[in-house]
UniProtKB/Swiss-Prot annotation:
Protein name (database record): Phosphoheptose isomerase
Gene name of the encoded protein: gmhA
Gene Ontology terms, MF aspect: carbohydrate derivative binding; D-sedoheptulose 7-phosphate isomerase activity; zinc ion binding
Subunit structure: Homotetramer.
Organism: Salmonella dublin (strain CT_02021853)
Keyword Cytoplasm: yes
Amino acid sequence: MYQDLIHNELNEAAETLANFLKDDANIHAIQRAAVLLADSFKAGGKVLSCGNGGSHCDAMHFAEELTGRYRENRPGYPAIAISDVSHISCVSNDFGYDYIFSRYVEAVGREGDVLLGISTSGNSGNVIKAIAAAREKGMKVITLTGKDGGKMAGTADIEIRVPHFGYADRIQEIHIKVIHILIQLIEKEMVK
């Protein structure tokens, strides 16, 4: 009944991944991002992650697997997803939704930390403000974006961009794979 739809969806996902893999810069960016994060942890830093909607869930997933575990037991790594509901509702009410991430970065970010900003469009105003706040703090910035990178293009130390201009879910599918690879590489770097 739905076999054609299922095949089409999986083929489109495979095509998106194949297009991402065609650009060696993506592979190098993932490696550089993992080393940057591990170096921050080794120096006593932490990572703050943020995004909206599905990207918010990806930011939480990233932090959870760093503080908890990925595939193997190991010490937890210092990662915080900016996802505290009381913080988000307070800042949204008192300052506006565009400031929910930047206020948190201003409060707990410090030089040597890393911000991971996730946006499939690259145009999330609150993530862009978080990047600016991270820069003010002397933090490094990694972004996971899609399409042409949007307004976030060129704002990060390392941008990992999925060049897909269709639905956001295709971009998110690559983002979660990148997140898992980052964690795997961080684990390898941390035991060097």
